[in-house]
Amino acid sequence: MTSYDSGDNFASAAMMRILALGLKQEGIHFDVPSSSGAHVPIHEKRKVLDEVITRLGPVSLLRVSDAVRKLPPEPLAQALLKAKTIEDLHRRWTRMEAFTHGRHRLHFEAKERGKYVLHHQASSGSVLPSQAETLLVVGVLTNLMEIVSSAPVTVATLRGQVWRQNETWFPPAVPTDDRRVILEVGDVSAAPRQAFASAGEPTEITARIRSLLAADPLRRWYLSEVAEELCLSQRSLQRHLAKQATTFSRLIADTRLQCAAKLLCEEPGRGLAEVGFLSGYSDQAHFTRSFSQHVGLSPQSYRNNV
Protein backbone atom coordinates (compact mmCIF):
# COMPACT_ATOMS: atom_id res chain seq x y z
CA MET A 1 0.00 0.00 0.00
CA THR A 2 1.24 3.46 -0.84
CA SER A 3 1.46 6.47 1.44
CA TYR A 4 -2.00 7.49 0.32
CA ASP A 5 -5.35 6.33 1.59
CA SER A 6 -5.11 3.73 -1.18
CA GLY A 7 -4.88 5.05 -4.67
CA ASP A 8 -7.51 7.57 -5.61
CA ASN A 9 -8.95 8.73 -2.29
CA PHE A 10 -11.02 11.73 -3.28
CA ALA A 11 -13.01 11.39 -0.04
CA SER A 12 -9.93 12.06 2.08
CA ALA A 13 -9.15 15.16 0.02
CA ALA A 14 -12.72 16.39 0.54
CA MET A 15 -12.34 15.95 4.31
CA MET A 16 -9.25 18.15 4.22
CA ARG A 17 -11.13 20.84 2.29
CA ILE A 18 -13.85 20.80 4.93
CA LEU A 19 -11.23 21.01 7.70
CA ALA A 20 -9.44 23.93 6.01
CA LEU A 21 -12.69 25.84 5.49
CA GLY A 22 -13.88 25.17 9.04
CA LEU A 23 -10.64 26.36 10.61
CA LYS A 24 -10.69 29.46 8.42
CA GLN A 25 -14.23 30.27 9.51
CA GLU A 26 -13.13 29.94 13.14
CA GLY A 27 -10.27 32.36 12.45
CA ILE A 28 -7.68 29.67 13.20
CA HIS A 29 -4.53 29.33 11.12
CA PHE A 30 -3.37 25.81 10.36
CA ASP A 31 -1.19 24.45 7.60
CA VAL A 32 -3.70 21.99 6.15
CA PRO A 33 -2.41 19.60 3.43
CA SER A 34 -3.19 20.76 -0.08
CA SER A 35 -6.45 19.15 -1.07
CA SER A 36 -7.28 20.49 -4.51
CA GLY A 37 -6.59 17.11 -6.08
CA ALA A 38 -7.64 13.56 -5.34
CA HIS A 39 -4.79 12.51 -3.05
CA VAL A 40 -3.90 13.39 0.52
CA PRO A 41 -0.99 11.54 2.17
CA ILE A 42 -2.07 9.65 5.28
CA HIS A 43 0.73 10.93 7.48
CA GLU A 44 -0.03 14.55 6.57
CA LYS A 45 -3.73 14.14 7.28
CA ARG A 46 -3.22 12.45 10.63
CA LYS A 47 -0.56 14.97 11.64
CA VAL A 48 -2.78 17.99 11.12
CA LEU A 49 -5.79 16.32 12.80
CA ASP A 50 -3.70 15.43 15.85
CA GLU A 51 -2.34 18.99 15.99
CA VAL A 52 -5.88 20.40 15.94
CA ILE A 53 -6.86 18.19 18.89
CA THR A 54 -3.68 19.03 20.82
CA ARG A 55 -4.03 22.79 20.37
CA LEU A 56 -7.80 23.24 20.36
CA GLY A 57 -9.29 20.16 21.99
CA PRO A 58 -11.43 17.32 20.58
CA VAL A 59 -14.61 19.40 20.28
CA SER A 60 -12.87 21.63 17.74
CA LEU A 61 -12.95 18.86 15.11
CA LEU A 62 -16.67 18.44 15.63
CA ARG A 63 -17.26 22.16 15.28
CA VAL A 64 -15.18 22.64 12.14
CA SER A 65 -17.15 19.84 10.50
CA ASP A 66 -20.07 22.28 10.31
CA ALA A 67 -18.19 23.86 7.40
CA VAL A 68 -19.64 21.16 5.16
CA ARG A 69 -22.73 23.38 5.00
CA LYS A 70 -20.71 26.20 3.42
CA LEU A 71 -18.49 24.12 1.19
CA PRO A 72 -18.44 25.55 -2.35
CA PRO A 73 -20.44 23.40 -4.79
CA GLU A 74 -18.49 20.31 -5.78
CA PRO A 75 -19.62 17.00 -7.30
CA LEU A 76 -18.84 14.79 -4.30
CA ALA A 77 -20.88 16.82 -1.82
CA GLN A 78 -23.73 17.24 -4.29
CA ALA A 79 -23.80 13.50 -4.97
CA LEU A 80 -24.17 12.74 -1.26
CA LEU A 81 -26.69 15.50 -0.58
CA LYS A 82 -29.05 14.33 -3.32
CA ALA A 83 -29.99 11.48 -0.99
CA LYS A 84 -33.74 11.27 -0.43
CA THR A 85 -33.53 9.61 3.00
CA ILE A 86 -31.00 8.91 5.75
CA GLU A 87 -30.79 5.32 4.52
CA ASP A 88 -30.07 6.58 1.01
CA LEU A 89 -27.30 8.81 2.38
CA HIS A 90 -25.75 5.85 4.19
CA ARG A 91 -25.90 3.78 0.99
CA ARG A 92 -24.16 6.54 -0.98
CA TRP A 93 -21.47 6.87 1.68
CA THR A 94 -20.87 3.11 1.59
CA ARG A 95 -20.58 3.17 -2.19
CA MET A 96 -18.06 6.01 -1.91
CA GLU A 97 -16.00 3.84 0.46
CA ALA A 98 -16.04 1.02 -2.11
CA PHE A 99 -14.28 3.33 -4.56
CA THR A 100 -11.70 4.78 -2.20
CA HIS A 101 -10.55 1.44 -0.73
CA GLY A 102 -9.64 3.37 2.42
CA ARG A 103 -8.26 1.99 5.67
CA HIS A 104 -11.50 2.67 7.53
CA ARG A 105 -15.20 1.91 7.11
CA LEU A 106 -18.41 3.24 8.59
CA HIS A 107 -20.87 0.59 9.72
CA PHE A 108 -24.46 1.81 9.97
CA GLU A 109 -27.01 -0.06 12.04
CA ALA A 110 -30.61 1.15 11.99
CA LYS A 111 -32.42 0.81 15.31
CA GLU A 112 -35.92 2.09 15.96
CA ARG A 113 -37.28 4.82 13.71
CA GLY A 114 -34.83 7.71 13.35
CA LYS A 115 -32.08 6.13 15.46
CA TYR A 116 -28.81 4.71 14.12
CA VAL A 117 -25.63 3.28 15.59
CA LEU A 118 -22.52 4.41 13.74
CA HIS A 119 -19.31 2.43 14.14
CA HIS A 120 -16.09 3.85 12.67
CA GLN A 121 -13.91 0.78 12.21
CA ALA A 122 -10.79 -0.43 10.47
CA SER A 123 -10.87 -2.29 7.18
CA SER A 124 -9.45 -5.81 7.20
CA GLY A 125 -5.76 -5.71 8.11
CA SER A 126 -5.71 -1.96 8.81
CA VAL A 127 -5.03 -0.04 12.01
CA LEU A 128 -7.93 1.47 13.91
CA PRO A 129 -8.91 5.04 13.06
CA SER A 130 -7.50 7.66 15.37
CA GLN A 131 -9.73 9.60 17.73
CA ALA A 132 -9.29 12.67 15.53
CA GLU A 133 -10.32 10.81 12.38
CA THR A 134 -13.44 9.45 14.07
CA LEU A 135 -14.47 12.87 15.38
CA LEU A 136 -14.17 14.52 11.97
CA VAL A 137 -16.08 11.73 10.21
CA VAL A 138 -18.85 11.75 12.82
CA GLY A 139 -19.12 15.52 12.55
CA VAL A 140 -19.33 15.55 8.77
CA LEU A 141 -21.85 12.71 8.60
CA THR A 142 -24.02 14.35 11.27
CA ASN A 143 -24.16 17.56 9.26
CA LEU A 144 -25.03 15.64 6.09
CA MET A 145 -27.81 13.81 7.94
CA GLU A 146 -29.25 17.09 9.21
CA ILE A 147 -29.22 18.58 5.72
CA VAL A 148 -30.82 15.52 4.10
CA SER A 149 -33.48 15.08 6.79
CA SER A 150 -34.12 18.80 7.42
CA ALA A 151 -34.10 17.89 11.10
CA PRO A 152 -31.69 18.20 14.04
CA VAL A 153 -29.58 15.15 14.90
CA THR A 154 -28.61 14.24 18.46
CA VAL A 155 -25.26 12.47 18.82
CA ALA A 156 -24.34 10.49 21.93
CA THR A 157 -22.00 7.69 22.94
CA LEU A 158 -23.28 4.26 23.95
CA ARG A 159 -22.68 5.35 27.55
CA GLY A 160 -25.00 8.30 27.13
CA GLN A 161 -22.55 11.20 26.86
CA VAL A 162 -24.06 13.77 24.50
CA TRP A 163 -21.84 15.17 21.75
CA ARG A 164 -24.47 17.15 19.86
CA GLN A 165 -27.91 18.43 20.76
CA ASN A 166 -30.03 21.29 19.43
CA GLU A 167 -27.41 21.91 16.71
CA THR A 168 -24.68 22.52 19.31
CA TRP A 169 -21.52 20.45 19.80
CA PHE A 170 -20.28 19.50 23.28
CA PRO A 171 -16.79 18.33 24.33
CA PRO A 172 -16.47 14.55 23.92
CA ALA A 173 -14.87 12.41 26.59
CA VAL A 174 -11.22 11.58 25.99
CA PRO A 175 -10.31 9.08 24.75
CA THR A 176 -13.20 7.94 22.56
CA ASP A 177 -11.93 4.38 22.38
CA ASP A 178 -15.20 2.73 21.40
CA ARG A 179 -15.62 4.65 18.13
CA ARG A 180 -19.36 4.00 18.21
CA VAL A 181 -22.00 6.66 18.58
CA ILE A 182 -25.78 6.83 18.44
CA LEU A 183 -27.31 9.33 16.03
CA GLU A 184 -30.98 10.17 16.51
CA VAL A 185 -32.83 12.22 13.92
CA GLY A 186 -35.54 14.59 15.13
CA ASP A 187 -38.90 15.14 13.45
CA VAL A 188 -38.29 14.89 9.73
CA SER A 189 -39.77 17.50 7.42
CA ALA A 190 -41.06 15.63 4.40
CA ALA A 191 -40.43 17.69 1.27
CA PRO A 192 -43.34 17.72 -1.18
CA ARG A 193 -42.78 15.56 -4.23
CA GLN A 194 -42.75 17.27 -7.61
CA ALA A 195 -44.00 15.12 -10.44
CA PHE A 196 -43.52 15.77 -14.13
CA ALA A 197 -46.49 16.78 -16.20
CA SER A 198 -48.63 14.00 -17.63
CA ALA A 199 -46.98 11.79 -20.20
CA GLY A 200 -46.69 12.63 -23.87
CA GLU A 201 -45.12 10.90 -26.85
CA PRO A 202 -42.70 7.99 -26.27
CA THR A 203 -39.70 10.06 -27.40
CA GLU A 204 -40.62 12.81 -24.95
CA ILE A 205 -41.06 10.29 -22.15
CA THR A 206 -37.66 8.76 -22.84
CA ALA A 207 -36.07 12.22 -22.74
CA ARG A 208 -37.72 12.88 -19.38
CA ILE A 209 -36.43 9.61 -17.99
CA ARG A 210 -32.91 10.44 -19.15
CA SER A 211 -33.23 13.83 -17.47
CA LEU A 212 -34.33 12.23 -14.20
CA LEU A 213 -31.52 9.68 -14.22
CA ALA A 214 -28.84 12.20 -15.17
CA ALA A 215 -29.88 14.52 -12.34
CA ASP A 216 -28.87 11.89 -9.77
CA PRO A 217 -26.76 9.02 -11.17
CA LEU A 218 -26.01 7.66 -7.69
CA ARG A 219 -29.63 7.07 -6.82
CA ARG A 220 -30.89 3.49 -6.81
CA TRP A 221 -33.61 4.08 -9.35
CA TYR A 222 -36.65 1.81 -9.63
CA LEU A 223 -39.08 1.64 -12.52
CA SER A 224 -41.99 2.22 -10.14
CA GLU A 225 -40.47 5.50 -8.90
CA VAL A 226 -39.90 6.83 -12.40
CA ALA A 227 -43.41 5.82 -13.45
CA GLU A 228 -44.81 7.74 -10.49
CA GLU A 229 -42.74 10.81 -11.37
CA LEU A 230 -44.14 10.68 -14.91
CA CYS A 231 -47.72 10.05 -13.76
CA LEU A 232 -47.77 6.69 -15.54
CA SER A 233 -48.38 3.09 -14.55
CA GLN A 234 -45.39 0.78 -14.73
CA ARG A 235 -47.01 -1.16 -17.55
CA SER A 236 -47.64 1.99 -19.58
CA LEU A 237 -44.07 3.13 -19.07
CA GLN A 238 -42.72 -0.23 -20.21
CA ARG A 239 -44.86 -0.03 -23.35
CA HIS A 240 -43.52 3.45 -24.10
CA LEU A 241 -39.94 2.22 -23.72
CA ALA A 242 -40.63 -0.81 -25.91
CA LYS A 243 -41.82 1.50 -28.69
CA GLN A 244 -38.42 3.18 -28.49
CA ALA A 245 -36.67 -0.21 -28.63
CA THR A 246 -35.07 0.32 -25.24
CA THR A 247 -35.44 -0.72 -21.60
CA PHE A 248 -35.19 0.97 -18.24
CA SER A 249 -31.94 -0.81 -17.37
CA ARG A 250 -30.49 0.23 -20.74
CA LEU A 251 -31.30 3.87 -20.03
CA ILE A 252 -29.60 3.63 -16.64
CA ALA A 253 -26.48 2.13 -18.22
CA ASP A 254 -26.45 4.78 -20.96
CA THR A 255 -26.81 7.57 -18.41
CA ARG A 256 -23.86 6.31 -16.36
CA LEU A 257 -21.77 5.97 -19.49
CA GLN A 258 -22.58 9.50 -20.70
CA CYS A 259 -21.88 10.98 -17.27
CA ALA A 260 -18.51 9.20 -17.08
CA ALA A 261 -17.52 10.21 -20.61
CA LYS A 262 -18.36 13.84 -19.89
CA LEU A 263 -16.28 13.89 -16.70
CA LEU A 264 -13.35 12.12 -18.37
CA CYS A 265 -13.30 14.65 -21.21
CA GLU A 266 -14.08 17.87 -19.39
CA GLU A 267 -12.34 17.35 -16.03
CA PRO A 268 -8.90 15.80 -16.65
CA GLY A 269 -7.79 16.48 -13.10
CA ARG A 270 -10.53 14.35 -11.55
CA GLY A 271 -9.37 10.85 -10.59
CA LEU A 272 -10.84 7.76 -12.23
CA ALA A 273 -12.30 6.44 -8.97
CA GLU A 274 -14.16 9.69 -8.37
CA VAL A 275 -15.44 9.68 -11.96
CA GLY A 276 -16.79 6.16 -11.48
CA PHE A 277 -18.41 7.03 -8.17
CA LEU A 278 -20.05 10.22 -9.43
CA SER A 279 -21.35 8.38 -12.49
CA GLY A 280 -23.25 5.85 -10.39
CA TYR A 281 -21.16 2.69 -10.77
CA SER A 282 -21.05 0.30 -7.81
CA ASP A 283 -17.25 0.06 -7.62
CA GLN A 284 -14.06 0.58 -9.63
CA ALA A 285 -14.20 -2.85 -11.28
CA HIS A 286 -17.81 -2.30 -12.39
CA PHE A 287 -16.87 1.08 -13.86
CA THR A 288 -13.85 -0.19 -15.79
CA ARG A 289 -15.59 -3.32 -17.06
CA SER A 290 -18.80 -1.61 -18.17
CA PHE A 291 -17.08 1.38 -19.75
CA SER A 292 -14.59 -0.78 -21.65
CA GLN A 293 -17.34 -3.10 -22.86
CA HIS A 294 -19.48 -0.32 -24.32
CA VAL A 295 -16.79 2.09 -25.54
CA GLY A 296 -14.02 -0.30 -26.54
CA LEU A 297 -11.47 1.60 -24.46
CA SER A 298 -10.67 1.64 -20.76
CA PRO A 299 -11.58 4.89 -18.96
CA GLN A 300 -7.90 5.94 -18.89
CA SER A 301 -7.39 5.16 -22.59
CA TYR A 302 -10.56 7.04 -23.44
CA ARG A 303 -9.32 10.10 -21.52
CA ASN A 304 -5.94 9.91 -23.25
CA ASN A 305 -7.31 9.51 -26.77
CA VAL A 306 -10.46 11.61 -26.94
Label for each model-derived stretch:
Residues 152, 159-306:
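Extended mid-to-C-terminal alpha-helical interaction segments
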Residues 10-11, 40, 133, 201, ...:
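Short, contiguous, pocket-lining structural segments
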Residues 8-12, 129-130, 219:
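Residue-level recognition of alpha-helical structural elements
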Residues 26, 56, 145-149, 230, ...:
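A broad structural signal for alpha-helix termini and local helix breaks/kinks
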Residues 1-107:
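N-terminal low-complexity or simple alpha-helical regulatory segments
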Residues 52, 65, 93-96, 145, ...:
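Broad structural signal for hydrophobic residues in well-ordered alpha-helices, predominantly aliphatic
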Residues 78-183:
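DNA-contacting interfaces and partner/effector-binding or oligomerization modules
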Residues 17-22, 139-143, 248:
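Conserved short hydrophobic patches within well-ordered secondary structure
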